């Protein structure tokens, strides 16, 4: 894992290479994951490694942004997140209407606001709608909420002196099959939980008692109904606002809360080291045979974590929303 250090203007200011004690690099398909780098506290690094600098790799287009730097006992520990973290510092005040295309509507929201330095949105044409109304969020929250709802990925990449946010959704490749029996992965953990699972939101808006405004968000999809009460009294109907518009805002709150209370089926596994980043990558759909559990699953690679230390890299892959075929 060869690293480079960039300043806030994306000028390369140091070639770190593999001259670090350890590095943890994690990326999510439509989430923002963590980064940590530990180095010997040389005079050069103490001078150059600062918060809001960026770290890149020779083998990936993505970046990490440093948010915290600690110096102690002759070492520097720089930690941060994927570069998409900076989108949390850009606000959107307004409304994206139901049916708007995810990529173009978020790009428009960003371009009409206070742009982040050296960050643009790439031109994409996914033609994937977000079928709910959403208002008044950070640009990062727009990306996370809309993309997670519709299985779309987003990432910030570097292209010379500019960063670009791009949206993507790889199609299913039937040739991407992994199994312990094939020798191309080992299962680290499997977890299935309905502890916090809810699929039917009862959203309570303005008013009191029997006059309390109610809307319903049904995500049961044929499953047993699991109710979630959502107190949305903070969302008040505005002057001259239509019932349809107000209901849409309440429904959007219900969708957000249901996303926070889903059934979890997670599977973490370690792939054959040379396959990841070559045969498949973040966002690709894998077919995984879990022979010990009698399960075949299909899911996107939702997150990967790579730990580099002593010239060895350990890669762990995690998958997200899963289609189970028993």
Region annotations inferred by a language model:
Residues 1-17:
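Polar/acidic, low-complexity leader/linker segments enriched in S/T/G and N/D
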Residues 10-13, 60, 293:
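Residue-level signal for glycine
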Residues 18-45, 185-326:
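An acidic/polar, Gly/Ser/Thr-rich interaction patch typically located in mid-to-C-terminal regions
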Residues 24-33, 68-76, 156-161, 308-311:
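Short, ordered beta-strand-loop transition motifs
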Residues 28, 37, 80, 93-120, ...:
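Amphipathic, non-transmembrane alpha-helical segments in extracytoplasmic/periplasmic proteins
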Residues 42-120:
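Surface-exposed cap/loop segments at beta↔alpha junctions
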Residues 48-55, 179-182, 283:
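Glycine-centered loop/turn motifs
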Residues 70-77, 82-87, 122-198, 202:
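Short beta-strand-centered interaction patches in the first periplasmic/extracellular domains
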């Amino acid at each position: 894992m060869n690293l480079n250090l960039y300043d806030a203007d994306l000028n390369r200011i140091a070639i770190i290479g593999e001259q670090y004690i350890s590095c943890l690099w994690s990326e999510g398909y439509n989430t923002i994951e963590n980064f940590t780098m530990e180095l010997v506290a040389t005079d050069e690094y103490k001078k150059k490694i600062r918060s809001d600098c960026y770290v890149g790799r020779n083998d990936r287009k993505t970046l990490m942004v440093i948010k915290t730097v600690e110096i102690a006992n002759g070492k520097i520990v720089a930690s941060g997140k994927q570069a998409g973290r900076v989108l949390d510092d850009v606000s959107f005040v307004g409304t994206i209407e139901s049916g708007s295309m995810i990529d173009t509507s978020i790009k428009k929201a960003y371009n009409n606001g206070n742009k982040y330095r050296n960050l643009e949105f790439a031109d994409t044409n996914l033609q994937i709608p977000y079928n709910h109304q959403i208002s008044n969020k950070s640009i990062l929250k727009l990306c996370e909420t809309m993309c997670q709802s519709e299985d779309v990925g987003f990432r910030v990449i570097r292209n010379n002196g500019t960063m670009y946010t791009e949206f993507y959704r790889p199609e299913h490749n039937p040739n991407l099959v992994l199994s312990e029996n094939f020798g191309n992965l080992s299962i680290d953990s499997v977890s299935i939980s309905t502890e916090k699972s809810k699929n039917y939101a009862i959203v309570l808006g303005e008013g009191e008692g029997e006059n309390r405004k109610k809307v319903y968000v049904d995500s049961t999809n044929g499953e047993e109904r699991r109710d979630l009460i959502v107190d949305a009294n903070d969302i008040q109907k505005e002057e001259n606002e239509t019932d349809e518009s107000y209901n849409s805002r309440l429904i959007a709150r219900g969708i957000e809360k249901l996303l926070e209370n889903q059934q979890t089926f997670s599977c973490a596994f370690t792939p054959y080291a040379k396959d990841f980043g070559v045969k498949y990558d973040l966002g690709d759909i894998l077919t995984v045979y879990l022979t010990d559990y009698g399960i075949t699953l299909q899911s996107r690679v939702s997150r990967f974590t790579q730990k580099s230390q002593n010239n060895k890299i350990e890669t762990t892959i995690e998958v997200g929303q899963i289609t189970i075929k028993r």
